[in-house]
Amino acid sequence: MQQNKVDLPPVRASGALLSLAGVGKVFSNGVTALDNVDLAIGEGDFVSLLGPSGCGKSTALRIIAGLSLPTSGTLEWRGGSFDRSGIGFVFQEPTLLPWASVFDNVWLPLRLRGVSKAKAAPAIMEMLSRVHLDGFAEAVPRELSGGMKMRVSIARALVTKPRLLLMDEPFAALDEITRFRLNDDLLSLWRDERFTAIFVTHSVFESVFLSSRIVVMAARPGRVFEELAVEAAYPRDEAFRTSPDYAALCRRASDVLSAAMQANGGGRDDGH
């Protein structure tokens, strides 16, 4: 079924928001996590890093976030520098403060920037509404499902209005129906908030549904194997998930992922 087009963030014509050139990472134990990675991320892009375990997807995110330094190569931001306070990060584990309310968990990054609870309240309540957690502001994490905890984590990452959102397999531990709903909501947030997104995943299906571009990585050492443009209009919904176009894009991405895994001597990855 043909998808209705919507306006996307003004992207790709404006050039890369960030570029990795020849980036390598060798850990202290001698393991090479990344080798000569070249990657450009356009402002407004939704890019998935897809690949088997050990291909350096998470390491690349940490380097971009400034949580790890590359052993070699360069990371360049458009304009020469980038305030990393403009980066949001969503991890696989929600990492919520167990004793704090949902409201206070989302307030945390604003609190660390000196924003009072009263001043932050409108932005927090708006973001909780955007992630469908109306009525849960005073709940604590033990009262929430896994999917709801992830919604809190997404709200916390986006409440500061980041320019770049990094996500490290955020939905991997959730059931398929919850993942579908979160994928739908994440795309809605991406369109409305107009941030750039880098999404790490093992799932072919998830990467095709979400992304404007997929970067398939190979392991041992971690490197870019091939980049795929996802030529499908937004918005993407249940009709897109059941369309022949989606099935064809998934087959193509799966074939490239299989080739990448063969390039590093086999290994297993179920595409999820």
Where are the language model's segments positioned?
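Conserved ABC transporter NBD signature motif
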Residues: 73-85
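Conserved ABC ATPase "signature" region
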Residues: 107, 111, 118-136, 188
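Short coil-to-helix segment of the ABC ATPase nucleotide-binding domain corresponding to the Q-loop/switch region
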Residues: 100-107
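Conserved signature/switch motifs of ABC ATPase nucleotide-binding domains
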Residues: 139-142, 160
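Hydrophobic anchor residue at the start of the ABC signature
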Residues: 154
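The feature captures the beta-strand-to-loop junction immediately N-terminal to the Walker
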Residues: 50-52
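Helix-to-loop junction immediately C-terminal to a conserved catalytic motif
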Residues: 65
